[in-house]
């Protein structure tokens, strides 16, 4: 790192300077730290220079350097106390020095200094710990885009070797007598945990097998982290997607301290200490496997699309981005419709509805009713799952996060869909439906065969139905269920009408049937230029974020038109039809870049719905004739 990047390579040095320049008792230094790093990170190039834990191996990162991490809050632990400011006494000269404990897991002092636990100048503070995992189902193109934007300079290092760590501390330590210096082992009691009463102990890396990192989806990779949050933690909740900038802590002392606890635990009655030990294993895994990040700046992400500005409101740059894209939106929509029509074997009507589904999102809740959701059931799909899985690969190229769920009897009976509270470990055990907002979930019902659902299977199917209907998942807290609202785009592919509820049912009518589906769709994706796919990704991501409104005049026109429709066909037009028409009209308007309802888009919605219903009636008639 160059001198100009010392705020990245040695953020604790920056904090020390601001701490020393202020009266620690008044707390202004803490605000100054946040302001300093926030100002640095407002510059996009500076932010891109911070190494990212998502795409950088942990052993490439220097301990106590500034890192960033894009993640989902999987669990929130109980608040913990730590020594925000503590005083040491020099055993040789009796000189007293104040140190900061914020952004650290262990208290730092020089060899001849000892912490005075009874000092009146000590300040006990509180912080919150989030257990965070990489965004579940984050698509490869998103990871690649973020990686390509990174300007961080990292090289391999032996981050966990004590000798290397000691050298790093000594190189950076000359500026002030109270700077960081490594301990030489547990023989010297110079490094104390900064947590006050009830301090957490950490398990050694040699303990049993590698811990379960609690990822919601099977097969996920990437680091899990314990995020230490110091301010505003009540602004965040479970399943939020965050971008965290903070100080990386992989201190070997965290594991070394735990070895003492393991030795003590071995002398106790195992039955008495089992629950406590299990909780420590869950809350304090080895830092080499689950590093700690002490946050300085934490941002809740409005979306996880690297092609869009972080927010569409506020800056002139964002407004210009939106304006420029809207000017070419019509052409992009036409190309996307053609692309999806090919993916759906030439069915342009199904492609229209798939576009509406992809741009849908829950934008508000009225009592218990989620507004904006548009679960699509695409029936008539070729049986055996090949088509559905290939369609998922297409969707995966367009949205930031997605997951494919084969709805087999075995999966329904064996997979854990619903997160549950483990009271022994005092943690939330993840389930498959613990997903970040705006994740696309493709449920492949074409693989469903005759069989018996057990109790778990029934609960899982019920959970899927509640997710689709109410956009909520009832987490299992043993003694009660707790509702967690969600915002998941569910696409159900089926042979006949799905067993699951949906907002819209479209029967697929292929205009072609290639002899080799995999080769056909593979060629379609290969022929799509990255620049074109990026336009599709921007289109879908942007339209999810646009506001929409209906004027009083348009509302009156819709009401009058609906009354007329009921007069002409009272048997087949219901309140549900009006609701669906309004949803389709809203999404159709947004798909054309219009943020208010026009007569043209209302008529367009009516036309689409009429075509969809006619097709369903024809299919029903064909099925009856086949009986």
From Swiss-Prot:
Stated family: Belongs to the MCMBP family.
Gene name tied to this protein: mcmbp
Region (Disordered): 166-187
MF (Gene Ontology): chromatin binding
One annotated Gene Ontology cellular component of this protein: nucleus
Entries under InterPro entries matching the protein: MCM_complex-bd
Function: Associated component of the mcm complex that acts as a regulator of DNA replication. Binds to the MCM complex during late S phase and promotes the disassembly of the mcm complex from chromatin, thereby acting as a key regulator of pre-replication complex (pre-RC) unloading from replicated DNA. Can dissociate the mcm complex without addition of ATP; probably acts by destabilizing interactions of each individual subunits of the mcm complex. Required for sister chromatid cohesion.
Name of the protein in question: Mini-chromosome maintenance complex-binding protein
Keywords, ordered alphabetically: Cell cycle, Cell division, DNA replication, Mitosis, Nucleus
Location of the protein in the cell: Nucleus
Source organism (scientific name): Xenopus tropicalis
Subunit structure: Interacts with the mcm complex: associates with the mcm3-7 complex which lacks mcm2, while it does not interact with the mcm complex when mcm2 is present (mcm2-7 complex).
Species lineage: Eukaryota, Metazoa, Chordata, Craniata, Vertebrata
Cross-referenced PANTHER family: MINI-CHROMOSOME MAINTENANCE COMPLEX-BINDING PROTEIN
A biological process from GO: cell division
